[in-house]
A protein has these predicted regions:
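Short, charged, surface-exposed secondary-structure boundary motifs
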Residues: 1, 96-99, 213-215
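Active-site-proximal beta-alpha core segment in soluble small-molecule metabolic enzymes
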Residues: 1-24, 29-32
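Anion (oxyanion) recognition and catalysis
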Residues: 9, 80, 197
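Conserved structured catalytic cores and adjacent interaction surfaces
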Residues: 127, 156-160, 170, 189-199, ...
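Conserved, mostly hydrophobic/aromatic
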Residues: 17, 61, 110, 153, ...
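Iron-sulfur (Fe-S) cluster-binding modules
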Residues: 177-185, 201-287
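Catalytic alpha/beta core domains of metabolic enzymes, predominantly
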Residues: 20-23, 28-178, 182
Length: 287
């Protein structure tokens, strides 16, 4: 241990104390009977105290378990007993889909309660996907603001456009944009415009044509075969505007032609609009 401490001190780098439910010390397994959250927390505290006894404090701690509830409990318990930074993650989470879900639930709960300083999403997939999922978790909790956030409605009998294809295409074609923007792809105008109020820009399907809107305000009708290209162009222009505003520089403005505001554009009245109230549920920790 002294050699490790000497090496990291010479290089001025922190040390990560990593505790894993799959490799817990035998005495703690005998004491608790299984790799419980209490056992994980005690193991981490023992390691921290051993390093402190050597005069070393430049560290962060991780307590990983593949069970979401056990990981949450372990991190929460340790956070009540120590102030060291926490590297959070659900280890061996699973494949791209199941691992992303487990990580989103576990890391989302911890982060929403102020627990966690760095994170790792563990997937049996391309490591690039791990980074993408991690950023999406942070973006969903509004802890990081970078890139396009595509908001798309589920398919139903009212959809007038191929929402699934267009949403996926948007994520790929707008992946180069770093400016944080909410972009909506909504299948119809019945609920679409109301739901799109929280988006910076978006489109909704109509009868033989689509509509372009910004912040829930109708901008203009667009032929179906031009809808995707128009949205991509407008998103890129909006990103440029926001970047210029952030830099304090003038910009040329959007090429959108301001259409007459109101639902009359698509033959609907304002009272058909709807709004969404989004609540972030809190996952109770299982004891």
């Amino acid at each position: 241990m002294q050699e490790v401490i000497k090496a990291v001190n010479e290089r001025g780098i922190p040390l990560r104390v990593g505790v894993n439910g799959g490799s817990l010390e035998r005495p703690l397994l005998d004491k608790y009977g299984w790799p419980s959250p209490e056992a994980l927390s005690e193991s981490a505290l023992n390691a921290v105290h051993a390093l402190e006894d050597e005069g070393f404090t430049n560290m962060k701690v991780s307590l990983k378990a593949s069970d979401v509830h056990h990981a949450i409990d372990a991190y929460y318990l340790f956070s009540t007993q120590s102030n060291y930074p926490l590297h959070i993650g659900i280890t061996e989470a699973g494949t791209a889909m199941t691992g992303a879900v487990k990580s989103a639930i576990g890391l989302g709960w911890l982060l929403s309660h102020g627990i966690g300083d760095t994170l790792r999403v563990s997937l049996a997939a391309d490591p690039v996907e791990e980074v993408k999922v991690g950023f999406e978790i942070l973006k969903s909790l509004e802890l990081r603001h970078r890139g396009i956030n595509v908001i798309a409605c589920p398919t139903c009998g009212r959809v007038e456009i191929d929402v699934v294809r267009m949403a996926n295409e948007l994520e790929k074609k707008l992946g180069h944009i770093k400016t944080p923007l909410n972009v909506s792809v909504l299948g119809c105008v019945v609920n679409g415009i109301g739901e799109g109020k929280e988006a910076d820009i978006g489109i909704a399907g109509g009868e033989g044509k689509g509509i372009l809107f910004k912040k829930g305000k109708l901008m203009r009708k667009v032929p179906m075969d031009e809808l995707m290209d128009t949205l991509i162009q407008e998103v890129e222009l909006l990103a440029e505007e926001k970047e210029a505003e952030a830099a304090g520089a003038p910009h040329n403005g959007s090429s959108s032609e301001q259409a007459e505001a109101g639902w009359e554009l698509m033959g609907h009245t304002p009272d058909e609009q709807s709004t969404i109230v989004r609540d972030i549920p809190v996952l109770p920790s299982k004891s």
